[in-house]
Regions:
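N-terminal, positively charged nucleic-acid-binding surface of large information/translation enzymes
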Residues: 1-168
Length: 168
């Protein structure tokens, strides 16, 4: 019998189990939908943030519900999605453009100056180039919440993830 460590080190155990659960497709509904089914859509967090305690509580409660339905033998789908959060995304990308233009600016008022400069640069770029820049930002940063939920072990079927700006 191996010794049980005195201190729990989640980083040495949890990623392995999370990968196993995904590899075994435990969170995917069966193709055979002849039995009872249960599904919920993930209330879509937006791409601009990180999970906060409210998300954690809500996702834990939903995860418990989804697992309970699976244990009852139901075919369960927890469908994930992300919201584009256009206004928040615009503000973040504008601030990023401002920071790039004013890299040495620090201290009080820097954030406001970055935002103003970013707005000026957005207008200078035009809508097409700015939208392209927003898509680049989304590709680089939009998966933060997904990674956090995966780390928590949320029983979501990520193979079906949707984004509010996905083509229909």
């Amino acid at each position: 019998v191996p010794d049980i460590p005195k201190v729990y080190a989640p980083e040495s155990i949890e990623p392995r189990w999370a990968r196993y659960w995904v590899d075994q497709k435990l969170y995917r509904p069966l193709d055979d939908a002849s039995g009872p089914t249960f599904s919920l859509s993930l209330p879509p967090p937006n791409i601009t943030g990180s999970l906060h305690m409210g998300h954690m509580l809500e996702h834990t409660e939903i995860d418990i519900l989804m697992r309970w339905h699976r244990m009852r033998g139901q075919n369960v789908l927890w469908l994930p999605g992300m919201d584009h959060a256009s206004i928040s995304t615009q503000m973040i990308v504008e601030r990023e453009l401002g920071r790039e233009a004013l890299p040495d600016l620090e201290g009080p008022g820097a954030r406001r100056a970055w935002q103003r400069e970013g707005q000026r640069r957005r207008l200078e770029m035009g809508p097409e180039k700015f939208l392209e820049r927003c898509w680049q930002w989304k590709e680089q940063n939009g998966d933060t919440i997904r990674r956090q939920m995966e780390r928590m072990g949320a029983s979501v079927d990520w193979t079906r993830a949707r984004f509010t700006m996905d083509p229909a």
